Amino acid sequence: MSLEIVPFVVAIPARFSASRLPGKPLRLLGGRPLIHRVAERALSAGAREVWVATDDVRIAEAVASLDGVHVAITANTHLSGSDRLAECARIAGWDPEVCVVNLQGDEPFAPAAGIRAVAALLHHSNADMATLATTIDKSEDLFNPNIVKLVCNAHGEALYFSRAPIPWNRDTFATTREPTPLGPWLRHIGLYACNAGFLQRFTTMQPGTLEQIESLEQLRVLEAGHRIAVRITPEHFPPGIDTPEDLAKAEKALEDV
């Protein structure tokens, strides 16, 4: 499906105290802070504005050297990246209808076409939020809890997100752990689009049981009865960086380019 380019802004939530990889935004990838590489992906996509939302002065100072990137100093009490971006939207003064792309701060290889596509998907759907997914064909990815899986309905909207391998193939997985063509299994890509007004509504939703169990903020949207449009993207999205092992793989990928 080809989607036209629509105007959008990008906001990148970044916190220093990531439990699995402390100081993640400032970790070096190819000799440069990770947050620099993520922000530059947003700029390359043609965003009207690019903001980094952080509660840490070290991250703010690192971003200050980037041309065309703004910084929002936010509270340190936010429960999720989307809560942080809602404050960023208020600081930036965006109108409620502005399309905001939430680009996770651990996605240094996000293709520009994918960033534009999620904004276009929101524009062309009736959903409150839009996101992307790609197919899974490796067992190690399907059973990796750091790689989020999702299932959709017949209208291309998310039914559920999980760290567990969903859907569970009862018969096949009784004897093997290899994905089969009966899926397809989908990997969620940490990229969302919604309008600035919906970000403010998000902050009024209470985190539900599912969000707290899975530690996945997008489940708050589903639990509250809202819809998330999903596009299975043809663009190659390397997994995000959550652990020291992920960072080492990303470093090697850069060296191999």
From Swiss-Prot:
Highest taxon of source: Bacteria
Catalytic activity: 3-deoxy-alpha-D-manno-oct-2-ulosonate + CTP = CMP-3-deoxy-beta-D-manno-octulosonate + diphosphate
Listed transmembrane segments: none
Pathway: Nucleotide-sugar biosynthesis; CMP-3-deoxy-D-manno-octulosonate biosynthesis; CMP-3-deoxy-D-manno-octulosonate from 3-deoxy-D-manno-octulosonate and CTP: step 1/1; Bacterial outer membrane biogenesis; lipopolysaccharide biosynthesis
EC numbers on record: 2.7.7.38
Pfam families in alphabetical order: CTP_transf_3
Annotated GO CC locations: cytosol
GO biological process, one term: CMP-keto-3-deoxy-D-manno-octulosonic acid biosynthetic process
Alphabetical UniProt keywords: Cytoplasm, Lipopolysaccharide biosynthesis, Nucleotidyltransferase, Transferase
Subcellular location: Cytoplasm
Record GO terms (molecular function): 3-deoxy-manno-octulosonate cytidylyltransferase activity
Protein function: Activates KDO (a required 8-carbon sugar) for incorporation into bacterial lipopolysaccharide in Gram-negative bacteria.
Similarity field: Belongs to the KdsB family.
Protein name as annotated: 3-deoxy-manno-octulosonate cytidylyltransferase
